[in-house]
Regions:
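Short amphipathic
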Residues: 1-8
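Rieske [2Fe-2S] iron-sulfur-binding domain
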Residues: 16-103
């Protein structure tokens, strides 16, 4: 099911937004070039919110320990993380961000 997250203009390029869906937190990321990605908002190395991290066009970096994750796949690209994080399909319709999410 596609869930509406926010207006595209509410998410600035190079930033991430933490969104709670029930007990599950997602990081909705807008890259500096304007692409929008969605992934679990928890570093696989620890209980750290990725949405507070550093965003570039291909990765998000955990602010606490520096683990980087590929935005398209959730694959860890640097230690200390070695487990991937889940990613979710993003849809943009009428300048609104939606995420495909099944509970």
């Amino acid at each position: 099911m596609a869930l509406r997250i926010c207006a595209l203009d509410d998410l600035k390029p190079g930033k991430a937004l933490r969104v709670k869906i029930g007990d599950h937190a997602l990081a909705i990321v807008r890259t500096p070039s304007g692409d929008v990605k969605a992934l679990d908002d928890k570093c696989s190395h620890g209980e750290i919110s990725l949405s507070e991290g550093f965003v570039d066009d291909k990765t998000i970096e955990c602010w606490a320990h520096g683990a980087k994750f590929e935005l398209d796949t959730g694959k860890p690209l640097s230690l200390p993380a070695y487990e991937p994080v889940a990613t979710y399909e993003v849809l943009i319709e009428n300048d609104e961000i939606f995420v495909e999410y099944e509970d």
